[in-house]
From Swiss-Prot:
GO terms for cellular component: DNA-directed RNA polymerase complex. This is DNA-directed RNA polymerase subunit beta'. It comes from Borrelia hermsii (strain HS1 / DAH). Belongs to the RNA polymerase beta' chain family. The gene is rpoC. SMART domains: RPOLA_N (SM00663). InterPro entries: DNA-dir_RpoC_beta_prime, DNA-dir_RpoC_beta_prime_bact, RNA_pol_asu, RNA_pol_N, RNA_pol_Rpb1_1, RNA_pol_Rpb1_3, RNA_pol_Rpb1_3_sf, RNA_pol_Rpb1_4.
Length: 1377
């Protein structure tokens, strides 16, 4: 065999009959396997030694030649070659079939490949192959048509009429003849002409046929090879027969399937020799076809062949498919030697790079090393003796083991391994007992706890593997999370509590207010018990007295020397930022030292503090009753409104839920306030939550406040909350509601974990071949990034989005003009600070989305590697890291729901508009009318505001140094005050002088308003921070009259488009527009003037509640109808994970919106077939049609001006529309924002570039729109780079290039469409992928990771890249003379 490492490509083709014969070492003629008396293989049977090789090493079957010296000799008596028995793993046989048989992969799988080539439907093809119908092969001079199907009677009739002047036949022979007669070139040009004729109306079948024909032409496969005359028999060791204890045999299912084929084949051969009647022969041929089908794919047939125990037999295809198939079970994941597993316990005494391995386990794992050392030390002279010494566990063995494991790393892995930090290397330390000891700080990366978790240990054997473990996988080299660059090794629970206690301040304790000259004096005073840890003291640091506490001095004293004095109470968040800061300033070695000190101090002082909780620590606020009574009063008022018919049932429900949410929030705030004051902040429950050691505000609320609203099984919120808390105890009904929530949490967790795991698998599959391959792709494109804001609040600063990327443009300081950032320069933390000081908050950076590297991405576009904060190395497998970064939190989040126990988490909706800081109203957008109490927005609107960042009274100013509207930055002189001091700006913004005030204001911002908002301020007003400027109804969207006049109903017919319901609770009549669609009816309300002329009309969507009567007078601002918002549901990542799934799979959402295809003016047209036609007239007067389902709530009205991409009705956006209307860049931004939104809501931080890598893979293909002079087919989907290559070639030859449009493909589909057939086959739909690949003669270039793992090569990333493989180490021989 060819050396497994020296090929670079692998190809798959259909085997011809000659090829199968050339593989074979002989024909299998009998169906026997083993002679049950002698237990030797039968001659010419399925295990025959003459064909497949000897079963005994270097011995022939009859025993005439018995020794290695006869190697290669073929025995003259039994014809068996003297060889090694391992040849039985590689030698194949064959079966000569008595009648041709079609291969099930090519005729049965949809679309049927043979059917497409011959243009026969699958059902017709089946009836020919199973000998039910004849097909005309040559019609001769009859009036039959070629390829016409005839049944038995028709065939006999034609035979009588025309005699032998035509030929028709059935079975695989007929199909074989037809395939042999095909002229592919002629067929191809015929189909291409048809496609040109049909143009846009091309059906998919034409495209499929053309693709298959082109594939056959290019690959050199012949169509008739899909019909088999010879059947290969796989080597016997791969379908073994094993003797069990009771003398019975267990055999592979394949042997049974082969036996059936051989038996039927032999029977058919006899029947043919005997010239048996046609009907019998035909039946036998059909049975042969069936048995070969079962052999190749038993699960795909309607009648599955079953074995002895009535279970379906496992055929060749089944052996490849699925999780238990060859690919996933044996090639992508293997069980490995030198490994063990055990329960983990905490090892507080370990260093960060160590783990404790039980001595017994270590001895077993390192056995070969120990044996070698024993022999080297001449204690023993053979392996057998060494093994017995090890079994006796003599002292010498333990000494040797100690030496062996020194500096020999081991890998620890915890399942599920969701990201690369699930396997890390440690130096082993021998421990007593049987449990593995794990360092407490690495638990977070493993997501491990010590409640019975198990971990696996692996020993890297070769020096290269050990070196990689030390250099790359050691726990001390993996301090940062590759997903976002934040530390992943940080303290939690006990350690945090200990340090929080140590660094807290307490009033009136021993030693308060004392002064100390240095740290040593403080420590001495503590040891002498004359100073309390929590006492506030003054210590001299760098010649100055600093107010701090004794505990903080203890903490700082222990830290490594370089770190500046940390003077604050340390919570988990503070500790994480301290670790981050130290990492950036001092590097990893100091951090590692610091982490072990933090662990040690934390545990020590947690023990000293010895916190316990009792019932008296749970303090229920006395004001609870007041809050609950107030809520009940508000609810009575809401109920009253409902009874009067002012609000609908849905609004009532939403308002009630909102009241309880607010009450719960207020009560919680009060409770936390009380707990904080209790015992000077040393209330243990409060300390645990505040330090972040355990528990949360939400859990304390349930202990001491009220449990709050609960969710039903459906996810709806039950409007009656649980008012009790756990301290007071729950009533029976409250307890019952609680149990439901708790159970649901656990059930959901189990289901969603599988979901998130599957998401990770698909992500890995699509991105596995994205590797950093080159330094610079030379692109000039980039993406624009800016800080993400929610109104005025910065959700994600520019730093998070831009640090570690490379700039694509040169940025100069607007003041000095010097270059801050040059082209292709890395954006570092310092550069961002510089940009922020001069007021630049937008950047254009290089991104993976715009990278033009042909395979993978380039270093410059990827930027920084977050796992070490350095520029990414060439060879880094960034695709897999991206997939893990997105998949891992998915799984984490799904596991996190049950801790709160099903408590509903819907926020209370606010109905007031107030801004956090002072501002000036600069302008309004949107249709609004003047009413008594201000402005009323009849449709959606926008406020344009400028925030006031700084203000000063002009009277306090002596001399101004700036002009109105001038831009200022930090440090710029503003004015000289009355005392003659220069006042410098501490902000970035613009100067505004208004009403004797000097202000610095921000750039203009937009705040969107809902329809129905009442605004109490006017343009130009200055508004103080926190003032309520407007109100709206959060639970209903009103349709408001914009003119005065009379109401006239149009197409509002009771019983058809209008439904009157008597509300049983209130007795009121509610008028609701039905959501049924009627062809000719379009319910609207017209407003007419005194002369009866229509002024305007309002279209009423389905489910709108009418608020007016026909013929009544109406004023500007009156509500005509309103739409209730759906009731609140609790949202956790269950809402999140399916959403992420849908986005990555690019599924079209259920409740779709229609987007304006172009910018222009809206024109309403009639309803046709249940859809309303809306035209948008563009600037050239061209009409663009949009069809919208009639019941939908429209967001535009007749005559509105819209921009391309604006939503015309409510609903979800379809990503494919975004691509079509707004283009690729907008689509990337849309997907990125939507996916990040789901994760951000859950508090998960993932860097954009990871999601970018996946989106890039989803947009790899383009669809051919015009063929030009290329070989492409209209509507074909091709790889971008293949498209550019071919176009380049055509242009060079002076031809016309093809035109294509970008398309978006979901991750599953994209994984199956990948260039590597090995990778696609090992993902899903194995047989389909292999069928198509074999027809096309696909070549796998082995560029990705999966395909290399499957065939046993080193993966082409990191040290496995060709770039590094060619490195040679030479000794420098030029020594001095």
């Amino acid at each position: 065999m060819k050396e497994i490492k020296d090929f670079e490509k692998i190809r798959i083709k259909i085997a011809s009959r000659d090829q199968i014969r050339s593989w074979s070492y002989g024909e299998v003629k009998k169906s026997e396997t083993i002679n049950y008396r002698t237990l030797r293989p039968e001659k010419d049977g399925l295990f025959c030694e003459r064909i497949f090789g000897t079963t005994k090493e270097w011995e022939c079957y009859c025993g005439k030649f018995k020794s290695i010296r006869y190697k290669g000799i073929i025995c003259d008596r039994c014809n068996v070659e003297v060889t090694h028995f391992k040849v039985r793993r590689e030698r194949m046989g064959h079966i000569e079939l008595s009648a041709p048989v079609a291969h099930i992969w090519y005729y049965k799988y949809i679309p049927s490949r043979i059917g497409l080539l011959l243009d026969i439907t699958a059902s017709n093809l089946n009836s020919i192959l199973y000998y039910e119908k004849y097909i005309v092969i040559e019609p001769g001079d009859t009036d039959l048509k070629k390829m016409q199907l005839l049944n038995e009677d028709e065939y006999s009739e034609a035979k009588e009429r025309y005699g032998m002047s035509f030929s028709a036949s059935m079975g695989a022979e007929a199909i074989k003849t037809l395939l042999e007669n095909l002229d592919l070139d002629e067929l191809s040009s015929k189909l291409r002409l048809q496609m040109i004729d049909k143009d846009d109306k091309t059906d998919k079948k034409l495209l499929r046929r053309l693709e298959i024909i082109e594939n056959f032409k290019v690959s050199g496969n012949k169509p008739e090879w899909m019909i088999m005359d010879v059947l290969p028999v796989i080597p016997p060791e791969i379908r073994p027969m094993v003797q069990l204890d009771g003398g019975r045999f267990a055999t592979s299912d394949l042997n049974d399937l082969y036996r059936r084929v051989i038996n039927r084949n032999n029977r058919l051969r006899k029947l043919l020799l005997l010239n048996a009647p046609e009907i019998i022969v035909r039946n036998e041929k059909r049975m042969l076809q069936e048995s070969v089908d079962s052999l190749f794919d038993n699960s795909h047939k309607r009648k599955v062949v079953k074995g002895t125990s009535n279970r379906p037999l496992k055929s060749l295809s089944d052996a490849l498919k699925g999780k238990q198939g060859r690919f996933r079970q044996n090639l992508l994941g293997k069980r490995v030697d030198y490994s063990g597993r055990s329960v983990i316990v905490v090892g507080p005494e370990l260093k960060l790079h160590q783990c404790g391995i039980p001595a017994k386990m270590a001895l077993e794992l390192f056995k070969p090393f120990v044996i070698r050392k024993l022999i080297e030390s001449e204690s023993v002279f053979n392996i057998k003796r060494a093994k017995s010494l090890i079994e006796q566990e003599v002292d010498e063995v333990w000494q040797i083991l100690d030496n062996v494991i020194k500096e020999h790393p081991v890998l620890l892995n915890r399942a599920p391994t969701l990201h690369r930090l699930g396997i890390q290397a440690f130096e082993p330390v021998l421990v007593e007992g049987k449990a593995i000891k794990l360092h407490p700080l690495v638990c977070h990366a493993y997501n491990a706890d010590f409640d019975g978790d198990q971990m696996a240990v692996h020993v890297p054997l070769t020096p290269a593997a050990q070196a990689e473990s030390w250099a790359l996988m050691l726990s001390t080299n993996n301090l940062l999370n590759p997903a976002n660059g934040h530390p992943i090794v940080f303290p939690s629970q006990d350690i945090v509590l200990g340090l929080y206690y140590l660094t807290m301040e307490r009033k009136n304790v021993v030693g308060e207010g004392r002064k100390f000259a240095n740290f040593n004096h403080v420590l001495l005073a503590i040891n002498n018990k004359s100073l309390d840890y929590n006492a506030q003291i003054y210590v001299k640091i760098d010649g100055e007295y600093i107010a701090t506490t004794a505990g903080r001095v203890v903490f700082n004293e222990a830290l490594p020397g370089k770190i500046t004095f940390v003077n604050k109470t340390l919570s988990d968040y503070e500790l994480q930022s301290l670790i981050s800061e130290v990492y950036v300033i001092y590097g990893s070695s100091i951090v590692i030292e610091m982490l072990d000190i933090i662990k040690e101090l934390g545990f020590r002082y947690a023990t000293k503090f010895g916190c316990t909780i009792s019932m008296s620590d749970i303090i229920v606020p006395e004001e609870k009753k007041i809050y609950v009574d107030k809520a009940n009063r508000e609810i009575a008022k809401i109920q009253n409104d409902y009874t009067k018919g002012v609000i609908t049932g849905e609004e009532r429900y939403n308002n009630v839920v909102s009241v309880w949410s607010k009450t719960n929030e207020e009560l919680t705030n009060k409770m936390m306030e009380i707990l904080k004051k209790d015992r000077d902040g040393f209330n243990v429950i409060y300390m645990m939550a505040d330090s972040g050691a355990r528990g949360s505000r939400n859990q304390i609320r349930q202990l001491a406040g009220m449990r709050g609203l609960m969710a039903k099984t459906s996810g709806d919120i039950i409007e009656l909350p649980i008012i009790s808390n756990f301290k007071e105890g729950l009533s029976v009904i409250e307890f019952f509601i609680s149990t439901n929530g708790a159970r649901k949490g656990l059930a959901d967790t189990a289901l969603k974990t599988a979901d998130a795991g599957y998401l990770t698998r698909r992500l890995v599959d699509i991105a596995q071949d994205v590797v950093v391959r080159i330094e610079d792709c030379g692109t000039i494109n980039g993406i624009k990034v800016e800080a993400l804001k929610n109104g005025e609040e910065i959700v994600e600063p520019l730093r998070e989005k831009a640090v570690g990327s490379y700039s694509i443009e040169r940025i100069k300081s607007p003041i000095t003009g010097e270059i801050i950032l040059d082209v292709n320069e890395e954006v570092t933390e310092d550069k961002i600070k510089l940009l922020e000081t001069v007021g630049i908050d937008k950047l254009v950076i290089r991104s993976v989305l715009t990278c033009e590297a042909e395979h993978g991405v380039c270093q410059k576009c990827y930027g920084r590697d977050f796992s070490n904060n350095k520029p990414v190395n060439i060879g880094e497998a960034v695709g897999i890291i991206a997939a893990q970064s997105i998949g891992q939190p998915g799984t984490q989040l799904t596991m996190r729901t049950f801790h709160i126990g099903g408590v509903a988490q819907a926020g209370s909706e606010d109905d007031k508009i107030a801004l956090k800081n002072a501002f000036i109203l600069n302008g309004l957008e949107g249709f609004n009318v003047q009413v008594d109490d201000g402005l009323l927005f009849t449709r959606k609107g926008t406020l344009k505001v400028i925030n006031v960042i700084y203000e000063e009274n002009i009277k306090e100013i002596k001399e101004l140094k700036v002009l109105d509207s001038q831009k200022v930055i930090k440090g710029m002189p503003l004015f000289i005050n009355k005392n003659g001091i220069d006042v410098l700006s501490t902000h970035i913004g613009y100067v505004k002088i208004k009403d004797d005030k000097l202000m610095i204001v921000s750039e203009e911002q937009e705040i969107s308003l809902k329809a129905g908002t009442r605004l109490e301020i006017n343009v130009g007003d200055y508004v103080e921070a926190g003032r309520v400027i407007g109100t709206f109804d959060p639970f209903a969207e009103p349709i408001i009259a914009e003119f005065k006049g009379k109401v006239k109903f149009k197409d509002i017919i009771l019983g058809t488009t209008l439904k009157e319901e008597i509300n049983l609770e209130t007795g009121n009549i509610e008028k609701r527009i039905t959501d049924q669609v009627f062809e000719s009816l379009d319910p609207r309300i017209l407003i007419i003037n005194d002369r009866g002329v229509e002024i305007t009309s309002y279209v009423l969507p389905g489910d709108a509640y009418l608020q007016v009567e026909d013929g009544q007078d109406i004023n500007i601002g009156d509500v005509i109808a309103k739409l209730s918002k759906g009731s609140e549901k609790t949202q956790d990542i269950t809402g999140g994970l399916p959403r992420v799934n849908d986005l990555f799979e690019t599924r079209i959402p259920k409740n779709l919106t229609e987007m304006a295809k172009v910018s222009g003016i809206v024109q309403f047209k009639a309803i046709q077939k249940g859809k309303r036609l809306i035209n948008v007239l563009d600037e050239y007067g061209v009409e663009h049609k949009h069809y919208i389902p009639a019941g939908k709530h429209l967001l535009v009205r007749d005559g509105d001006v819209v921009k391309a991409g604006d939503m015309l009705c409510d609903g979800r956006i379809n990503p494919h529309d975004v691509l079509e209307i707004l283009g690729g860049i907008s689509l990337q931004e849309f997907l990125l924002a939507e996916i990040q939104d789901v994760y951000r809501k859950q508090g998960v931080s993932i860097n954009d570039k990871h999601i970018g890598v996946i989106i890039k893979q989803m947009m790899k293909k383009v669809k051919i729109v015009s063929v030009g002079d290329t070989n492409f087919v209209y509507n074909q989907k091709v790889d971008k780079h293949a498209f550019y290559e071919q176009n380049k070639r055509v242009i060079e030859q002076g031809g016309e290039p093809a035109v294509a449009s970008p398309i978006l493909i979901g991750i599953t589909k994209a994984s199956l469409n990948i260039d590597s057939f090995i990778s696609a086959a090992s993902f899903q739909e194995t047989t389909k992928v292999l069928t198509d690949a074999s027809i096309a003669g696909s070549v796998d270039d082995l560029k990705g990771l999966k395909e290399n793992v499957v065939i046993g090569h080193l993966i082409p990333t990191g040290t496995g890249m060709n770039l590094y493989k060619r490195v040679k180490v030479r000794e420098n021989s030029s020594s001095e003379v």
